[in-house]
Amino acid sequence: MMSLLFYAPLFSYEVKEWDRKKKALLSRINRSEFGYYGLNDFQTDRHSKKNRYSLDFEGIFSEELEEFKKEANLEYLRVMDIWTLKYTKKTENHCPHNHRSIGYTGLMYLEYDDKV
C-alpha cells in the first residue's frame, strides 16, 4: 500500500511590475554585509544587523502577498524574517531543508544567470 508521507503545496506567482519591484527591493539589500557563516556554502546577509527589510518587502510585494493570503485561506499574514543569499562560485549551494511544521517559506530569484 502506498500512502503520502507529507503534503507540500507550492504556490507560484508572477510579479506585476517586476522591474520596478526588483529595483526597489535590491536598493534595500546592503550588499556589503554579506559573508560566509558556519558551514554554509554561500554568502548571506542573514546575520547582518543591517538586514531589516522585511517590512519593505511586505510593502513592495503587497499585491502578491495578498493574492497568496487569499489562496492559502489565511486571516493574517506577516513576513517575520527575510534574508538574501549570494552565490559567486559554481560550487556554492543551499541544501534542501525544512523550516519546521509552522508557517510558510518563500523563495524569490532576484538576479540569476539563466545559462547556468
List the predicted regions and their residue ranges.
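A short glycine-rich, His/Asp/Glu-containing loop-to-beta-strand
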Residues: L74-K86
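Non-heme Fe(II)/2-oxoglutarate
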Residues: M1-Y76, N93
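Detector for methionine-enriched segments
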Residues: M1-M2, M80, M108
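Generic internal hydrophobic packing segments that stabilize the cores of diverse globular domains
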Residues: E58, S62, D81-T84, G103
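Residues at beta-strand starts and edge strands
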Residues: Y7-P9, R78-M80, I102-Y104
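Catalytic core of non-heme Fe(II) oxygenases with the double-stranded beta-helix
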Residues: T84-V116
